[in-house]
């Protein structure tokens, strides 16, 4: 239990730091004492693009590009065995596993198992994938940097079953 609290505190601190940095950058474009608020019922799931995902996944976009805030975020729900294709984020990404068990990997290396509370930080330009484990759903929250040219991700080839199943022990 204490370990879970430590992980939760770490995740909260990381998110606070990330969004505090964004807040400083956004101070000029967002009026003081105001915020954008979205009720949960206004958020909707959309099927993940089958051209860049293997298996069934859904995306809940939580924010679009906001002037002065160089990130966007969302929740991705991966069904068992579902995963992204290999991809690169020109301005980086981090994600937190909220539920289930998943896998993530960097091209040329063995994949890692990720569990609730784990945080994965993908610096700009790192070719990687993420998705659910073979027998369990995974839900993750992503925060992705917005590249000045407007492209948050470059999609590449499909992750093979061999790459997906090669796990770091």
Region roles according to the model:
Residues 24-70, 152-169:
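A short, N-terminal "cap"/entry segment at the start of jelly-roll beta-barrel domains
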């Amino acid at each position: 239990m204490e370990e879970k609290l430590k992980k939760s505190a770490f995740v909260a601190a990381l998110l606070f730091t990330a969004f505090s940095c964004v807040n400083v950058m956004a101070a000029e474009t967002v009026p003081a004492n105001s915020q954008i608020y979205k009720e949960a019922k206004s958020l909707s799931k959309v099927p993940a693009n089958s051209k860049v995902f293997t298996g069934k996944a859904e995306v809940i976009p939580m924010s679009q590009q906001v002037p002065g805030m160089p990130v966007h975020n969302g929740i991705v729900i991966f069904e068992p065995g579902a995963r992204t294709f290999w991809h690169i984020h020109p301005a980086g990404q981090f994600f937190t596993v909220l539920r289930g068990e998943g896998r993530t990997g960097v091209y040329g290396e063995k994949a890692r198992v990720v569990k609730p509370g784990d945080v994965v930080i993908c610096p700009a330009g790192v070719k990687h994938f993420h998705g659910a484990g073979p027998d369990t759903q995974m839900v993750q929250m992503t925060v992705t940097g917005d590249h000045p040219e407007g492209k948050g991700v470059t999609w590449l080839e499909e992750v093979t079953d061999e790459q997906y199943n090669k796990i770091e022990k």
